[in-house]
């Protein structure tokens, strides 16, 4: 189920802030001390920003297309779209880059709209594999191109700052649809264009 544009209206701002105070007390802090008095409000406002993707439908960004493209039917690639997301298992940050390619089928979309699709899915609780598939499916369903390729690189704080504590590790996922999946040459051209492997820790 897509929870786009849905909010839990039964949970108030005050209740969300009280939940933060509970976590502060659980951690051993005093939420009434001066340095923490505004923390619950700030955390709730930050969450409103970090998870604003639940209030959007990414498909909406791809509704306006352009068909006057003078017969252009070759690969279109947008690479190094930076994103910030949060792991749904530990609520820890995921920071990385998204690379998108598609073969138009008579229409194209403004490149900023592809970046907005990425933002909309990233600003939710995610696992990288799911986000990769969601972005590819959104583009395929809305633009109906001959093929779509999505590659995501991500550094996961749930691995670098807790548990195994392995810094410098990045995860790479891909989703290929249509010609990108069926034709090795198209897939290779896309992967050559995006040059996967730039250190996401430099972001």
Curated annotation (Swiss-Prot):
GO MF terms, alphabetically ordered: GTP binding; GTP cyclohydrolase I activity; zinc ion binding
Entry keyword set: GTP-binding, Hydrolase, Metal-binding, Nucleotide-binding, One-carbon metabolism, Zinc
Catalytic function, reaction form: GTP + H2O = 7,8-dihydroneopterin 3'-triphosphate + formate + H(+)
Residues involved in Zn(2+) binding: 87, 90, 158
Domain of life from the UniProt record: Bacteria
Recorded GO CC terms: cytoplasm
Pathway, per record: Cofactor biosynthesis; 7,8-dihydroneopterin triphosphate biosynthesis; 7,8-dihydroneopterin triphosphate from GTP: step 1/1
Gene Ontology annotations of biological process type: one-carbon metabolic process; tetrahydrobiopterin biosynthetic process; tetrahydrofolate biosynthetic process
InterPro entries: GTP-CH-I_C/QueF, GTP-CH-I_N, GTP_CycHdrlase_I, GTP_CycHdrlase_I_CS, GTP_CycHdrlase_I_dom
EC number: 3.5.4.16
Assembly and binders: Toroid-shaped homodecamer, composed of two pentamers of five dimers.
Family note: Belongs to the GTP cyclohydrolase I family.
Database matches in HAMAP family: FolE (MF_00223)
Name used for this protein in its record: GTP cyclohydrolase 1
């Amino acid at each position: 189920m897509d929870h786009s544009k849905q909010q839990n209206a039964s949970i108030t701002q005050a209740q969300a802030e009280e939940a933060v105070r509970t976590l502060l007390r659980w951690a051993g802090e005093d939420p009434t001390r001066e340095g923490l008095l505004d923390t619950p409000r700030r955390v709730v406002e930050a969450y409103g920003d970090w998870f604003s993707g639940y209030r959007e439908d990414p498909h909406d960004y791809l509704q306006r297309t352009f068909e006057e493209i003078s017969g252009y039917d070759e690969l279109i690639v947008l690479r190094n779209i930076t994103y910030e997301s949060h792991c749904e298992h530990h609520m820890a940050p995921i920071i990385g880059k998204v690379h998108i390619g598609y073969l138009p089928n008579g229409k194209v979309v403004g490149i900023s709209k592809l970046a907005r699709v990425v933002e909309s899915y990233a600003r939710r609780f995610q696992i990288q594999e799911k986000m990769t598939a969601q972005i590819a499916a959104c583009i395929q369903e809305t633009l109906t191109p001959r093929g779509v390729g999505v590659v995501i690189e991500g550094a996961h704080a749930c691995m670098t700052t807790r548990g195994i504590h392995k810094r410098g590790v990045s995860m790479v996922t891909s989703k290929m649809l249509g010609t990108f999946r069926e034709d090795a040459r198209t897939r290779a051209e896309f992967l050559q264009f995006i040059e996967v492997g730039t250190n996401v820790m430099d972001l």
